[in-house]
Amino acid sequence: AEEREQTAKITIGRGAKKRAAQLNGVDQPAASSLIGKFCAVVFSPDHLSLVKEGPSMRRKFLDAALCQRKPAYARLLSQYSRTLAQRNTLLKDISYHSELLETLEIWDEKLSGLGAAITIERKRYLERLSEAAGEIYDGISQGRERFAVRYDSGLLRDGGEEAGYRERLFSLLQNGRKEDLNAGFTTKGPHRDDLLVTVQEKSAREYGSQGQQRSCVLALKLAEAALLAEALGEKPVILLDDVMSELDASRQDYLLNKIQGWQVFITCCDPNSISGLSQGRTFYVENGAVSYTHLTLPTNSRV
């Protein structure tokens, strides 16, 4: 991490350039250029649906965590997304221009290389995340339940070495060509992968109680923070966005104990949800004005 103070600014507007980014007053080519400059782990009510929602939300969680650890991964992901979009466009165009079919192999080769690289990064990170989150879940459940998370990818189902992932994805794309042409989009690749979260070796999504699902998410987010701190050599900022009221008292206590000594920002609508805090500053918003005090909150304020 860079030790000198930096100022990042993102401007949201209208027109052709909807977002503009600056770092220390210098214009950046894209907002994505700021990735890795300010590292934070966000925990919001949306994340509580991480286990029970569809695969896209879990992929988004995984990719966001990896982008902060490795800004180069963000560029890899962007390249894959552009290549995927181009292949999908070609699949649709082929139905009207059959002579384009012979160009599909070029995109298969490019997509398989990028997809294999993404799969390797995700797989390696998930192995470490599962171990770290498992230890945290063990603490939340007081050793009563076993937690695990693993990467569910078409490239991994038959085993094999990482060196063979590119060739395997290329084969999947080739063999699935008819299906892709009928569908008009690419049906194989890391953009279709998922994370399988289990408690007691059963799917937390299908069989977990609401409490178990929330414990899983809490374990995953805290593990994300721990692994990011390890990679950076310093603790990232923790942002708890209106999530405290969604957790019961025991999970609130566990979360707050785990992040003692970290820089933490907590937003809430109910001041009572952070009444157990004994230190720090409280900022509150009233009629568009922001001020701060020391954990003495006005009623019905947004913190």
Where are these regions (language model features)?
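Nucleotide-state sensing region of NTPase/ATPase domains
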Residues: 1-57, 61-73, 130-138, 165, ...
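Generic alpha-helical secondary structure signal
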Residues: 33-36, 56-61, 82, 102, ...
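Long, non-coiled-coil amphipathic alpha-helical linker/lever segments
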Residues: 62, 69-122
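Conserved NTPase motor "head" modules and their coupling/switch loops across ABC/AAA+ ATPases, GTPases
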Residues: 97-237, 246-250, 254-257, 263, ...
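Walker B catalytic acidic pair
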Residues: 242-243
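Conserved small/polar residues in nucleotide/adenosyl-binding loops
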Residues: 293-299
